Amino acid sequence: MINRSHYTLFCPIWAFFGFVCFTYSSPVIPEIKSLEISEVSFQSEKDLPYLSKHYLSTKPVKHEDGIKLGDLMKESSKPEAILKIVDSFVATQKGIKAGKTDSFLVAKGGKLLLESYFRKGRINYPHYQMSITKSYTTLALGRAMQLGYLSMKELNKPIHQFLKDVKVDKFAKGASSITLQDALCMTSGIRIPKDRANARYIIKNPLKGQGHAQAIFEITEAVDSTKGQYKYQSADTSLVMQVIESVVPGGAEKLIREELFAPLGIDFYVWQEDLSGLPKAAAGSSLRSRDMLKVGQLVLNQGRWKGKQFIPADFIDRATSPLVKTNGNAHYGYFWWYESYEVSGKTYLSKQGRGAGGQFIIILPDIDVVAVITAHNKGMGGMLNQVCTALITAFSR
């Protein structure tokens, strides 16, 4: 007996939508047997073979990860909108940008309704994360706040006041005024010329620990005229991780592992170290797609997890608000993106974690939806718009 929940869009079950069947998905969810975390790396991910067949389930199966399950066909009034997106991933797997997608998951009301894997996607393989690592760093800061290690008021505190080992007298002009919120919004004003960030400086001035922060504050140009101006850069994220390291007993890595991820059931991941010895804040983590979904659900629930406030709601609200205008329709919060979409004359808000190459956590509060995408391709903005529009079409009433 064939499980119809594993057909792709073009299979007979979708005939009433007027499509023709071309391909079938695999009935077996793809995974790597006996995978050890030491085997997970950016390079090993590049070496993963393509799936011989993609995997699609509109009624996902249970795994020991605590995720609640549902049925897309029962929860969506227009499932074909989402399935068209899945088909675009399948039809171009070896071709254009949409075809370099590795996974696509959709949840509504806290239930996983659609789970699909393509190309290099595996349910148990942590996918490399680029700038979406910044979004996780924000949540680590929020978790530290919930645990009482700092307060909302301290977001306006100059960063150097958190760091006891830096030498303020060596800072560039204006750098001592940069606050934690400035860094979180990418508006610190820091501008580091390439000729100053060279090997000679690194050899002369060790970057371990707060030495990294010292270097950033020293070698930046004067920030008087640039402070408050948005510029997307890794220096700001590194400073935020430095603050987490300084205020949390045991440091940032322990906080992320024991206080942020472990309670969410995220125990199989990679988070690389920076030059400072701290966890990288700009990029460098690797998470499974289902674990990314948990992160999105946490944000959708205003920081609540399993009935308890896990991250302060007011912090989540501010972190995912449109605090800074960037380009086009997009705004920026605390390492989280904010964008709106108009469908059938109505505007829907979206909060997003984004990573270069195509890692996305899409949160649509108006329709109680979280979606996850992983991929290996840059310039997926157009595809992201199509996915958000499809999700809204599928679940709006």
Regions found by a protein language model. Name each.
Residues 26-38, 353-397:
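Structured C-terminal helix/loop/strand segments within mature extracytoplasmic catalytic/sensor domains
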Residues 110, 128-155, 183, 240-244, ...:
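Active-site SXXK
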Residues 161, 171-266, 289-293, 297-298:
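Active-site-adjacent helix/loop patches that line small-molecule binding or acyl-intermediate pockets
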Residues 236-243, 283-305, 359-375:
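Active-site-proximal alpha-helical segments within enzyme catalytic domains
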